[in-house]
């Protein structure tokens, strides 16, 4: 059983307790951690929509540490990221594999980051089906359609040609952050919070 820390705040009405993730949502920080499945995706989508309703012009930061998961669940998060008005900054902590890497690349251009020791992996979708030959053919055609769609999404967000994307996606392709930056999955590798330019404003402090 995972223990989730509780944060207690003093308010004008007394003490108020939040789980740590809910408290971070107040700061417009969302976590995509663990396998991507329907229940988790529903929570992430709800958080994105809530934060847009709170302030449609302020950035949302999405921290990603995921091995991937269900394609349709991941695409529901992806579509919502593209649908809402606020910029969504993405940051890989730990790993962003499979659908996790797609969500990482889907952040707002110029605001996609990775910590230096993270791991990023892309590959084509996989699946299996048992049944009648006709049904197997139907499911095979569907997974090929999904593969094409995912390749087109990577093409859009990385700037690579579809042919290059298809070549990279043929097998599991593991990358360190710098390799991911070179192929356009992220924009920058960061080691400290001060490396990130918040809301594209450069703040320089000068002494003396």
Curated annotation (Swiss-Prot):
GO molecular function: ATP-dependent peptidase activity; ATPase binding; serine-type endopeptidase activity
Active-site residues per Swiss-Prot or TrEMBL entry: 98 (nucleophile), 123
Main location: cytoplasm
Entries under InterPro entries matching the protein: ClpP, ClpP/crotonase-like_dom_sf, ClpP/TepA, ClpP_His_AS, ClpP_Ser_AS
Catalytic activity from the UniProt record: Hydrolysis of proteins to small peptides in the presence of ATP and magnesium. alpha-casein is the usual test substrate. In the absence of ATP, only oligopeptides shorter than five residues are hydrolyzed (such as succinyl-Leu-Tyr-|-NHMec, and Leu-Tyr-Leu-|-Tyr-Trp, in which cleavage of the -Tyr-|-Leu- and -Tyr-|-Trp bonds also occurs)
Enzyme class label: hydrolase
Pfam families, alphabetized: CLP_protease
Biological processes per GO annotation: protein quality control for misfolded or incompletely synthesized proteins
EC numbers, comma separated: 3.4.21.92
Domain of life: Bacteria
GO cellular component: cytoplasm; endopeptidase Clp complex
Keyword terms of this UniProt record: Cytoplasm, Hydrolase, Protease, Serine protease
Assembly information from the UniProt record: Fourteen ClpP subunits assemble into 2 heptameric rings which stack back to back to give a disk-like structure with a central cavity, resembling the structure of eukaryotic proteasomes.
Function: Cleaves peptides in various proteins in a process that requires ATP hydrolysis. Has a chymotrypsin-like activity. Plays a major role in the degradation of misfolded proteins.
Record family assignment: Belongs to the peptidase S14 family.
Name of the protein in its database record: ATP-dependent Clp protease proteolytic subunit
Organism listed in the record: Wolbachia pipientis wMel
Taxonomic lineage of the native organism: Bacteria, Pseudomonadati, Pseudomonadota, Alphaproteobacteria, Rickettsiales
